[in-house]
Structure formats: structure tokens, C-alpha cells
Amino acid sequence: AARPLARLYGLPPEAAPAVILGLTGGYPVGAATVAELLQQGALSREAAARVNAFCNCASPGFCIGLVGLGVFGSARTGAVLYGIHALSALLTGLVVARGPMAQSAGGRAAAAPREGFASAFCGATQQAARTALTVTAFLTVFSVLLRLLRPALRALPYGDMLAGLIELTNGLDELTLLPLTICAQLTLASFLLGFGGLAVQFQARALTAPFALPSGAFTLGKLLHG
């Protein structure tokens, strides 16, 4: 799968794990994989910024279970939403990732020295813990923020829709409360899944922050994916 993805997007084959894991693992696995590839020296900052712009996706389980069954009462609806979501991510990549890659001798980070099993296992465990802590922290902060803003949002037309732009899960839970047709609700759900909400976006940014990736492509990618 690595070489077809590389040819399609003009990215190095080493970027393929971020795309595949991002599409299957859910938020923010794509960003975590990009950070790991940067740490290993497998990607340049330019390639990492390009793939990071479209590899942060909802998982099939999230779309089918939480959105399909939980919100719309239909696993089939969730599966269709995931298919649209995944296809939109891949199409977004054609916009934000294609183009000539700058050739720079110093473009890649220095590869980390090979580690023994014990060291690698400890490092992977610590990284997983940091990722889980980052996800939990941003979910907590934005859930509290949304609770504080709830009275003001409900005073606005379609304020419940704005909730999803802040914290995705809470916004999706309230979709069926909106006075919209089912078609409009599904369209809005698809947009929110692609955009991810600010909580998801900040999770991804936090994981790649040590590498100072340019943010323009990421912002454009989330808007286009939505």
C-alpha cells in the first residue's frame, strides 16, 4: 500500500503508515504516527506537514457505533458516513499533499539509534501514556468550556450545531435536536466528522508541536475534509 499512496500523493512511502493508521485508528492516531515518524527521522518536516493535513480521521468504530447507532439508530448509516469520511480524507490529500517536494539535505530529522527490546517497549509505553493524557486533557478542557458556553449557544439559532465545532462528541449527540431534515442532519454529521472540532484539532497539534510543523496545511486540510 505504501508505493501506490506515495505515487498518488507525491509523498515518500514512509508516510503510508500515518495515512492507513489515521483512517483506521481514529483521532488522533494519525498525528501520533506522524510524530513518531518524525522522531525516527523517517519523514521530513515538509512531508510530515502534508500528510498530517489529511491523516487525522474518525475510526470506523466511532462512525458506526457512536454516530450511526448512537445518534441515528442505524449501523448502516454509520458505515455510509465512514465511507464518505474516508473518501473525503483521501480526496483532501490530493489538494493539500500533491506538488513537488523540496529537496533538502537537512530536511529529515536525524534517525534515532536502534534500541533494545526493553528500551523500545518502555519508550512505546511512555509515548502511549503521553498520547492518552493529551487526549484526555483536551477532551476535559473543551467539555468544560462547552458546558460554560452552553447557555449562550442555546440562545443562538442553531447553537447546538456550533457545539460540534468546539467538541465533536457533544455536538454529534445533539444533532437530532436540530430542526433539520434527516438529510441535512447527515450532511452536518459528515462535516463535523471531517472538521473534527477544536478539541480534536488541538490534540493533533499538541502531538506534533515539538516538531514545529507549519499549521497552514493542517488548517486547510480540516476545512476541506469537513
Segment roles from a protein language model:
Residues 1, 121, 125-193, 197:
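Transmembrane helical segments that form the transport core of multi-pass membrane transport proteins
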Residues 1-15, 134, 138, 225:
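N-terminal alpha-helical transmembrane segments of multi-pass membrane transport
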Residues 8, 39, 72-111, 206-226:
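Juxtamembrane and boundary regions of transmembrane helices in multi-pass small-molecule transporters
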Residues 9-72, 162-177, 185-211, 220:
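Alpha-helical membrane segments and immediately flanking helix-loop junctions
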Residues 17, 126, 130, 134, ...:
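Alpha-helical transmembrane segments of multi-pass membrane proteins
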Residues 22, 80, 84-92, 138, ...:
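Alpha-helical transmembrane segments in multi-pass membrane proteins
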Residues 91-99, 141, 145, 149, ...:
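Alpha-helical membrane-inserting segments
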Residues 107-122:
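Short, membrane-interfacial amphipathic segments enriched in basic
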